[in-house]
């Protein structure tokens, strides 16, 4: 496989049993002033390159595909996630010894995905001919103007995520332009649709008046000569939504590996190729040497090396 060509990148974070306000606030940069940026960059072990002057370029995409400044939604990410879980009737298993904490046996309820790609390609989409060093956290980029190309890429990626997991299950779509490489954080709830259990009774509809509908019991109570005025209609079973990481991402490691591989292929076909980005590689598609090199690296280090 040829590797020295511009490629899309998809990084699937660790599946979560819970989601804190701290994690959500970082994704949405809530409460991040200049001092906060300096403190983040002071942690040399994490190789951070946050640039405060580019904070204003960050944006998010909300329901309906509307682009707004990052962190402008009145309800923060962790609360939106909880609201969706409540809608789905999801209740985590709580730890018997520590009732205020979620048990290790609780099902995973949210998955974070980072969409990105070749550093130069995304920088060109975002900044055009403007020259800037995105790895310099102290550079003054206050006059940099974000270009249309990055909005197009983000919207296409948002539509892809909504098509894949359902717009109502895409809880956050945050695009960061203040780090070394531009990327989109997508926070999702894994949801499957299942048919309702139990028997569904038939309906009897009047031939001349479709609005007149009887249950089986009501139809049987009619005189025999009147029953002929109705036609039988089988009621379709409805569906219910429920949180299920295993049904969406795979029940076994092999299933998840296949899902991730297909995710890369689908993203290339729907989005990547439009922006000159070749198909990316899932972890299982890397060589053993590449796996060893990436195994203990965090997101920021990988971004800095792109």
Label every PLM stretch briefly.
Residues 1-306:
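N-terminal nicking endonuclease/strand-transfer module with a His-rich metal-binding environment
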